[in-house]
Amino acid sequence: MKIIVHRGTHQIGGCATEIRTNQNGIIIDAGSELEGNTLMSIPGATEGKSNCDAVLFTHYHVDHIGLIESINDDIPLLMSELTLDILKLQNNRQKLFNTKIIDRITPFVTARTLSFGDIKVTPFMVDHSAFDSHMFLIEADGKKLLHTGDFRTHGFRGKGLLPTLKKYIGDVDVLICEGTTVNRSTKKSKSEFEISTEARKLLAENKYVFIVCASTNIDRIAAFCSAVPRGRYCLCDLYQKTLLDTVNEKAGLLSSLYTFPKMLTYSPALDEKMKQQGFCMFVRPGNYLSSRVMEQFKDKDPLVIYSMWQGYLEKNVSLQNALSGFRIEELHTSGHADLEAIHSVITEIKPKVIIPIHTEMPEVFKKYLETKLPCDGEEIFL
């Protein structure tokens, strides 16, 4: 087995990992960089005659899927069904990709093994800020490899990770593991349950509340929705409501958390009742509708809960301007694994070799078992 991390060995985002045998090869993710727009050159996948059996995507964030259009036309593209549904809605709204690319994507089924020649791939769901994210168990040449994708254990579905590893994965030869947050803090991340608890207090204390969070961060929206006091409006725009309805259709039967029964689509006809009863409204600063409603209630001293990475606010001048003059409370937790979660995965599956990706400090992993720290494009043979 040969492994090539084409990008992501010393940076967060923009990842692509190739796994090959003598006969076959697959690629996990093809992401654009968080800063900059550098294309990746992958012989046999983005240029030249195709020599790749499939590209599989862990989730819909652009730092994992942003370069999907660069993949050769004859190479199959795969992701989970709900990931594809959400991507289609995003693309209809934001025009991220040519629709011909979206039409090429085939959905896979969680826990159902896929075969690409002598490479077997089994996807398993993980908790992440992108709903329906997956990790991949890859079996080839008598070796077992686990590619975590982006994951965490402090979300609503995070408690399922270790039982899944124990029941379906077992010991592996190689762990390709994300390390987004290892350079930020050694503390345990705040859980989505804690976010919901803190939100409940803020919503009880403030009659008018706007929430700024990613429209596709379904767990975060669920955390706030569950905290809305009885008799208070819970609102979003039509795009956000369509996303939530799509999740409800696929995941609502599995958990009432994802049915969003309180959520209503905002309409100007509700303005007077919103003033009377109060509200919690999910907004997208810069969006015309959101901006209008926020300005309409600005003189009533509403609270804005900012629930995204602080770096976005620091770097985005238009976002700063949109929130200028409002009372702001930050309430957020990472969508990525903390050190405790990473350690628990390593302890459970006992890899012989660890290959860190999606990290600026891969050397942190050296405290664990044998760790290979390749550069982008370097070949690792097993």
Question: For each of these PLM feature ranges, what is it?
Answer:
Residues 1-56, 62-219, 223-226:
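His/Asp/Glu-rich metal-coordinating catalytic cores
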Residues 18, 134-348:
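Metal-dependent phosphodiesterase/nuclease catalytic metal-binding core
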Residues 61-63, 84, 110-111, 239-241, ...:
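Short, polar loop motifs at secondary-structure junctions
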Residues 69-72, 114-116, 294-299, 363-369:
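Short loop/helix-cap segments at secondary-structure boundaries that form the rim of catalytic
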Residues 104-111, 258-268, 372-374:
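Short acidic-hydrophobic, aromatic-tinged amphipathic segments that line or gate anion-handling sites
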Residues 110-114, 301, 375-381:
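Glycine-centered loop/turn motifs
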Residues 329, 348-349, 363-382:
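Short acidic, glycine/proline-enriched helix-loop-strand junctions
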Residues 354:
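Hydrophobic, well-ordered secondary-structure elements that form the walls
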